[in-house]
From Swiss-Prot:
Source organism of the structure: Danio rerio (Zebrafish)
Regions that span the bilayer: 40-60, 99-119, 126-146, 157-174, 187-207, 216-236, 258-278, 297-317, 328-348, 354-374, 391-411, 419-439
Protein task: Involved in acetylcholine transport into synaptic vesicles.
Glycosylation sites recorded in the entry for this protein: N82, N86, N292
Keyword match 4Fe-4S: no
Residue intervals annotated with topology Cytoplasmic: 1-39, 120-125, 175-186, 237-257, 318-327, 375-390, 440-513
Protein name: Probable vesicular acetylcholine transporter-A
């Protein structure tokens, strides 16, 4: 009897394992479906961007109060009864907070040119996994840090992780969604996650810090980051057999930087984000001084702006699908809205009035970002090689310039010139830059480059000479010609016996730029 029962249990277990194996196989096949895989990749990238921006902003209500608590005892003993020293200590503390907040963007700004080139060489999946791993470590350090130096290290490490994860994630979306309307929609979804992470993180961090302590918000984010990394490792399989050698060589980042169209887009991305980057560290003190705002009002200042940001993304995606040739106009309109809203901010007398221009700023940023990020990919497609790591590293650099300067420079400007002058200057800069986007008005009419390299790699051979040329390139490293007769070729890829060689410029079709 016991033998029969054990045999039945073994048979049942075998059936269960077989069913589980079959389901796992079906799941694997479903994941390998190209359309499903694109959606999963979009989810992975969006979660990575959400985490990065939540970690960027979640420290706003936590770190200043936590550092003040750590330093209060030593400062109390040192400055008791000495107001001049107390003022100096407060100024130094504000500077420390500003440098801590800016350190992430500064390191990200410095590393991005290198990560862009690295992404172009190895692909998008490995850098994304590297970025998620670094962000996980950074978040754990934040959770257990107990002094300024450790917090500074964690913040800087986050910048390194962001340089990998943000750039590779956006570039991967541009690569997977090659059709313009799909690309615009996918990048719009990514921007919505970025916005939600930035605007929802301060109240998320503030509430959890108040009721669960400093560690819990960071541990929660670290768990989500770990899950996203495991999903990336499972779905993308970044360390499986590589095929990068079959892909085109990306355009060097310095060449992309001097492209006038890409430079105009990069300048617009920097300029439109300056109001947000400069207002975030300064608006709380201004609200306390001018409208006696309560702490809960300061905490949710930017939360209502999430909804117009989503509206701006949605409208731009819909309009771009219907009128793709007006992308430059959507960006210019967004910059004008940002400029007007920035100028209105100092005129607000209460919290309810302030919500309106802040919503205008975020609505305008949504228009600019959603219109111009797909434009960068299109410019690379038609003017360079369709590899997107370096061009989105330039976009990330543009954002980092604004957010590196904001926490350090904004407070100094307010102190020396005033809050009104800061907002008028930011508004004027956006309005004056908007006409520069007229340079992009004919971008939609550009034709893809038909240089020899693009033609051979992307379109295949179109004639006898092109066929021979392509075969020569494929066998060049072996030292043989395409005919298989072991005829040596020289270092330029031409037959050694030829008296005349041709350069790429002489043999390629003209580029339409």
């Amino acid at each position: 009897m016991a033998t029969e029962e054990s045999g039945g249990l073994a048979q049942t277990a075998a059936v269960k394992l077989s069913e589980m194996g079959e389901r796992t196989k079906q799941l694997g096949n479903a994941i390998q479906d190209p359309e499903r895989q694109r959606r999963i990749i979009l989810v992975i990238v969006c979660v990575a961007l959400l985490l990065d921006n939540m970690l960027y902003m979640v420290i706003v209500p936590i770190v200043p109060d936590y550092l003040a608590h750590l330093e209060s005892e030593s400062e109390q003993a040192h400055v008791k009864g000495n107001s001049s020293i107390n003022i100096t200590q407060n100024e130094n503390f504000d500077l420390q907070i500003g440098v801590l907040f800016a350190s992430k963007a500064i390191l990200q700004l410095l590393v991005n040119p290198l990560t862009g080139t690295f992404i172009d060489r190895v692909g998008y999946d490995i850098p994304l996994l590297i970025g998620l791993s670094i962000m996980f470590v950074s978040t754990c350090i934040f959770a257990f840090a107990e002094n300024y130096a450790t917090l500074f290290m964690a913040r800087s490490l986050q910048g390194l992780g962001s340089a990998f994860a943000d750039t590779s994630g956006i570039a991967m979306i541009a690569d997977k969604y090659a059709e313009e309307s799909e690309r615009s929609r996918a990048l719009g979804i990514a921007l919505a996650f970025i916005s939600f992470g930035s605007l929802a993180a301060p109240p998320f961090g503030g509430v959890l810090y108040e009721f669960a302590g400093k560690r819990f918000p960071f541990i929660a984010l670290a768990c989500v980051c770990l899950a996203d990394g495991i999903l990336c490792l499972t779905v993308l399989k970044p360390f499986s057999s590589r095929t990068r050698e079959n892909m085109p060589v990306g355009t060097p980042i310095y060449k992309l930087m001097i492209d006038p169209y890409i430079a105009v887009v990069a300048g617009a991305l920097t300029t439109c984000n300056i109001p947000l980057a400069f207002l975030e560290p300064t608006i709380a003190n201004w609200m306390e001084e001018t409208m006696n705002a309560s702490q809960w009002q300061i905490g949710i200042t930017w939360l209502p702006a999430f909804f117009p940001h989503i509206l701006g993304v949605y409208l731009t995606v819909k309009l771009a699908a219907k009128y793709p040739h007006l992308q430059w106009f959507y960006g210019a309109l967004g910059m004008v809205i940002i400029g007007a809203s920035s100028c209105i901010v100092p005129a607000c007398k209460n919290f309810e009035q302030l919500i309106i221009p802040l919503c205008g700023v975020c609505f305008g940023i949504a228009l600019v970002d959603t219109a111009l990020l797909p434009t960068l990919a299109f410019l690379v497609d038609v003017r360079h090689v369709s590899v997107y790591g370096s061009v989105y590293a330039i976009a990330d650099i543009s954002y980092c310039v604004a957010y590196a300067l904001g926490p350090i420079v904004a407070g100094k400007i307010v102190h020396d010139l005033g809050f009104v002058q800061l907002n008028l200057g930011m508004g004027l800069a956006n309005v004056l830059y908007a006409p520069a986007l007229l340079l992009l008005r004919n971008v939609s009419l550009m034709k893809p480059s038909h240089s020899e390299r693009n033609m051979l790699l992307e379109e295949g051979a179109t004639g006898l000479y092109d066929t021979i040329r392509m075969e020569e390139r494929q066998r060049k490293k072996h030292g043989y010609s395409s005919s298989g007769n072991c005829v040596p070729i020289d270092e330029n890829g031409t037959f050694a016996g030829q008296s005349k060689s041709f350069s790429e410029e002489e043999t390629s079709e003209p580029e339409y730029i």
